[in-house]
């Protein structure tokens, strides 16, 4: 009888155990896309859930076109902060839109506002007992005429690295890893990682498409796998639970 009670208690506690939420915040390179069965564009965080066991729930809160500034000013961060609980994770990848210097609603100086917005995400995540993880922006497909992949993000990745170092934040250098990915595919084949279509090649588009920033399903899946592999390499006790939940 005693053994039966123990078994019932174990089953009950397992069924009602609180799951860990992995929040992903950032821009269109991460964000969920409408009509995913037809739409060839995918964000890498959109395809992240299948890499984890069911005890990790990915809440992809990345939104097209957002910078750290607009994400905060639109109260998107506030809504996440209110829900954060001890043991959760927040993956933070911004930069693409922070560099939009012609747009006052989005632009941030990498050495001031961008840096302090990242620090805010980190400190407020920790206030809730959750773990922040900083990621640099994914590389754009930007090969020159000699086949050299030219960086496009200015000092934003540098500031992300510096904040991670100074505040001892688990860190994934996604810019570096995706540069390696782009280079491994080369100037022509790397189009497969992005959105390159002629009229009639894809029913979702009614005209030519040549987008070297956003991702195809292949590109998104490759980068999600890169993120998973990078998580495994992080030497920080705070991510052990996440590591153990990888399939």
What spans do the regions from the language model cover?
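Bacterial Sec-dependent N-terminal signal peptides
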Residues: 1-19
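Acidic/histidine-rich helix-loop elements
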Residues: 31-41, 62-71, 100-110
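Short, flexible micro-motifs
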Residues: 29, 46, 65-68, 90, ...
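Alpha-helical cap/lid subdomain in secreted, periplasmic
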Residues: 75-221, 225-246
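Glycine-centered flexibility sites
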Residues: 26, 43, 62-65, 95, ...
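Serine-esterase "nucleophile elbow" of acetyl-processing enzymes
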Residues: 15-62, 78-88
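Flexible, active-site-adjacent loop/turn segments at secondary-structure boundaries
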Residues: 28, 42, 69, 154, ...
């Amino acid at each position: 009888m005693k053994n039966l009670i123990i078994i019932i208690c174990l089953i009950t506690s397992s069924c009602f155990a609180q799951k860990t939420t992995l929040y992903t915040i950032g821009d269109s390179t991460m964000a969920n896309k409408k009509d995913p069965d037809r739409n060839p564009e995918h964000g890498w965080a959109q395809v992240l859930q299948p890499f984890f066991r069911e005890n990790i729930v990915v809440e992809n809160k990345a939104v097209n076109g957002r910078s750290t500034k607009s994400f905060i000013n639109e109260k998107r961060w506030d809504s996440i902060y209110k829900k954060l609980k001890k043991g959760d994770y927040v993956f933070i990848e911004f930069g693409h839109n922070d560099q939009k210097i012609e747009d006052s609603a989005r632009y941030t100086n990498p050495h001031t506002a961008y840096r302090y917005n990242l620090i805010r995400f980190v400190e407020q995540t920790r206030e809730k007992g959750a773990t922040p993880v900083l990621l640099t922006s994914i590389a754009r497909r930007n090969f020159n005429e000699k086949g050299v992949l030219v960086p496009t993000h200015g000092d934003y990745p540098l500031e992300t690295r510096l904040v991670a170092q100074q505040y001892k934040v688990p860190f994934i250098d996604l810019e570096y890893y995706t540069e390696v990915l782009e280079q491994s595919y080369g100037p022509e084949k790397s189009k497969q990682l992005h959105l390159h279509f002629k009229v009639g090649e894809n029913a979702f588009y009614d005209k030519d498409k040549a987008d070297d920033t956003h991702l195809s399903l292949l590109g998104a899946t490759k980068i999600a796998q890169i993120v998973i592999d990078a998580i495994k390499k992080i030497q920080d006790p705070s991510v052990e639970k996440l590591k153990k939940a990888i399939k």
